[in-house]
C-alpha cells in the first residue's frame, strides 16, 4: 500500500516574523543539524511514501527549494491565510483528490510539532483502521506559553468536534 504524508504549511507565519525570526517556522532548527521539516520527514523514512506539501510558495520565496523540490514530493500552492492547517487541507482538497486514490494510507503532520516514533509500531497500530489521529489528551505544557491551539473532543474514541486556534482555558 502506498503511503502519503501531507504537510500543510499554508499559514503566513506572522507570529514568528513578529518575533523577529527570518526563517519560516517549518525550517527552524530543532536538533543539531536538523530542522522541523526534516524531523517530520525522518519519521517516515522506512515507508514507501510520497510527500504532499501544501503552502503558499510565493511566501517561501524559493528559499527552501532544497527541501521541497524532490522526486517524491508533490507541491500544492494555496493562498496564505491565518485559519489553521485544516483550512489549508480544505483549500487543497481538489488537488489532494487528484494525487491520492482510494484506500491509500495517509498521514497528516502539522509543522509546529516535533516527535519521534518507531514507524513499524505505528504501522501495526494503524493496521485495519480507516482513520487514526495522533494527539495528546487534556492540558499540554506548551499551552502555558500560548493557549491558542487546535482541539478535538471525542466520545468513545470518535471525534465529535474540531476547533482550531482556540484558547484551552
Listing of model-derived features with the role each one plays in the protein:
Residues 17-18, 62-65, 117-120, 143:
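Short glycine-/acidic-enriched loop or helix-start segments at secondary-structure transitions
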Residues 102-114:
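Short beta-strand-to-loop acidic/aromatic patch adjacent to the donor-nucleotide binding site
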Residues 54, 78, 109, 134-136, ...:
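Generic beta-sheet signal
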Residues 2-8, 15-17, 29, 33-105:
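Conserved N-terminal catalytic core of the sugar/cofactor nucleotidyltransferase
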Residues 8-11, 56, 111, 136-137:
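Cofactor-binding loop segments of dinucleotide-utilizing enzymes, especially the Rossmann-like FAD-
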Residues 115-169:
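Conserved core of the sugar-phosphate nucleotidyltransferase
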Amino acid at each position: 500500500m502506498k503511503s502519503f504524508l501531507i504537510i500543510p504549511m499554508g499559514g503566513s507565519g506572522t507570529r514568528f516574523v513578529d518575533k523577529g525570526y527570518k526563517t519560516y517556522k517549518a525550517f527552524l532548527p530543532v536538533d543539531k543539524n536538523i530542522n522541523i521539516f526534516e524531523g517530520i520527514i525522518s519519521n517516515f523514512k522506512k515507508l514507501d511514501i510520497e510527500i504532499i506539501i501544501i503552502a503558499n510558495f510565493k511566501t517561501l520565496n524559493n528559499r527552501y527549494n532544497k527541501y521541497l523540490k524532490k522526486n517524491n514530493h508533490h507541491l500544492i500552492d494555496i493562498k496564505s491565510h491565518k485559519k489553521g492547517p485544516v483550512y489549508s487541507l480544505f483549500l487543497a482538497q481538489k488537488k489532494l483528490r487528484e494525487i491520492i486514490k482510494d484506500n491509500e494510507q495517509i498521514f497528516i503532520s502539522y509543522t509546529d510539532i516535533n516527535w519521534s516514533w518507531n514507524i513499524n509500531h505505528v504501522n501495526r497500530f494503524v493496521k485495519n483502521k480507516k482513520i487514526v489521529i495522533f494527539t495528546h489528551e487534556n492540558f499540554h505544557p506548551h499551552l502555558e506559553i500560548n493557549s491558542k491551539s487546535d482541539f478535538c473532543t471525542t466520545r468513545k474514541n470518535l471525534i465529535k468536534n474540531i476547533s482550531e486556534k482556540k484558547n484551552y482555558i
